[in-house]
């Protein structure tokens, strides 16, 4: 014998009247809400005639900072190692400069990039940053692979993002550590300091080891560390 249907309605549940069973009040309420929203300010843009300008914290496509006509990047490879979708690849080359290395070629596959910003977080030179560019179109897969010619952007155009990074880093570390540029005196970001050493101190050449002692420090001697020569 099939079971009898069970009424699951609560005994205290209010029964709908005739108009409510027709759902007309709900329809009128929906139309009234739509009419109110039609008269409120619009949130949409008439793209492409009107463009949206993102805030400084926006994570658009990653770009490389170009400083004095050269990439700030030292080709350390940290961004490529930190990239979750493995979208970044590069090859380093030696250069006659205080930074010693820069990328011979640098590529980002924009079809793989997820705009997470990890590359920007780990970069010790602030050489790769997230721009405000969000409108990307490609006609083929080859066009989606950006090389140095598409990635390099002058530092002046990225001033807002670089200043935002300086404000952003301090609160991240809280009371444990304060981000200071002078902690990185050997890096490309501190060219004024290096120029001062060359001109004021009369140094004919600047070695990458000039800011540290030639002999191993106490912490290195404890495990037998030896400084490599030149």
Swiss-Prot record:
Its main location: membrane. This is NADH-quinone oxidoreductase subunit 9. It catalyses: a quinone + NADH + 5 H(+)(in) = a quinol + NAD(+) + 4 H(+)(out). It is found in: Cell inner membrane. It is an enzyme of class 7 (translocase). GO terms for cellular component: plasma membrane. Keywords: 4Fe-4S, Cell inner membrane, Cell membrane, Iron, Iron-sulfur, Membrane, Metal-binding, NAD, Quinone, Repeat, Translocase. Its cofactor is [4Fe-4S] cluster.
